[in-house]
Amino acid sequence: MKYQLTALEARVIGCLLEKQVTTPEQYPLSVNGVVTACNQKTNREPVMNLSESEVQEQLDNLVKRHYLRTVSGFGNRVTKYEQRFCNSEFGDLKLSAAEVALITTLLLRGAQTPGELRSRAARMYEFSDMAEVESTLEQLANREDGPFVVRLAREPGKRENRYMHLFSGEVEDQPAVTDMSNAVDGDLQARVEALEIEVAELKQRLDSLLAHLGD
């Protein structure tokens, strides 16, 4: 495929896509903002602990590949970054809002079921029902300039197939290692995680507001 990302590049791109929609008042992001987004403990799988230098290296690489661009100007002393991965003025990759939400969630969390994707992507796009989620996934799997996602074999004991993005190469279709979380219903767990993410976002906005008032 034309678009190939390493695991760290996928995390950076996913974070910028997410923040562009969920916290537009804080977008574009500074290096520190990208570090914080990459190392979030909510809506990230796996949870990472990247250093500023590691993130800066990814940002520099992605700028060279024209997947990001730097933004600076009057009154903007800190270099900030915005994504050009999709829906940019001169870019080839055009995605609908629903497709962006699903791709972003897959970049940030890896393989997931349609039910998990619907709950976890809700802050970026409100799917009307499961049929819309599944039809959007099928569109991404069958696009002429793709495919961008693939449906994986159903895991033992699971009701739904998982889907995975293909921006980091072919996916080894192997069941995940069983752990305690498998005992919890996937949809319910995803909803709880979505609420945790929303609380974290609200706390981040409150901290930012308090810091601004304190200046």
Curated annotation (Swiss-Prot):
Keywords: Acetylation
Keyword Acetylation: yes
Signal sequence segment: none
Family that this chain belongs to: Belongs to the UPF0502 family.
Keyword Acetylation: yes
Sites bearing N6-acetyllysine, chain numbering: 80
GO CC field: cytosol
Protein name: UPF0502 protein YceH
Domain of life of the organism encoding this protein: Bacteria
InterPro entries, A to Z: DUF480, WH-like_DNA-bd_sf, WH_DNA-bd_sf
